[in-house]
């Protein structure tokens, strides 16, 4: 399951780098949880053909992540925001101050997304 989640995250960031066929097969595998046999039947190719396309596409996504690191960076930023929020969750604040604090954190997350394009 972890592998499929990671593949889905990589697809969300780097999908435009794949061919249309790779996209289709990887999405069926990662998002729809289809078996190789199900994908082969849908696509009209052999199970081995699906495996080859799946492996080539996944390798390209992993190589791109190793070079660019968007998924890794986003995970670090999310962890830092979560840690910051948890550290201050028990600090007594008035409701309006708590709302402002949460708003600033959401804005910060949005800035990171805008800068990274994710």
Which positions does each model-derived feature cover?
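C-terminal flanking helix
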Residues: 58-65
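Short amphipathic alpha-helical boundary/capping segments
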Residues: 9-18
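Intrinsically disordered, low-complexity basic tails/linkers immediately adjacent to helix-turn-helix/homeobox/MYB/SANT
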Residues: 67-93
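Short alpha-helical "recognition helix" segments of helix-turn-helix
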Residues: 38-40
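Residues within the DNA-recognition helix of helix-turn-helix
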Residues: 53-56
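Short amphipathic alpha helix immediately N-terminal
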Residues: 20-31
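Key DNA-contact positions within bacterial/archaeal DNA-binding proteins
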Residues: 47-48
């Amino acid at each position: 399951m972890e592998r499929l989640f990671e593949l889905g995250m990589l697809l969300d960031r780097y999908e435009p780098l794949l061919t249309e066929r790779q996209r289709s097969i990887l999405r069926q595998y990662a998002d729809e949880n289809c078996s190789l046999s199900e994908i082969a039947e849908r696509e009209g190719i052999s199970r081995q053909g699906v495996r080859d396309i799946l492996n080539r596409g996944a390798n390209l996504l992993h190589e791109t992540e190793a070079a660019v690191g968007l998924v890794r960076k986003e995970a670090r930023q999310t962890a830092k925001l979560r840690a910051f929020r948890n550290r201050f969750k028990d600090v007594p604040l008035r409701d309006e101050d708590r709302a402002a604090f949460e708003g600033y954190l959401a804005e910060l997350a949005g800035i990171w997304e805008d800068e990274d394009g994710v």
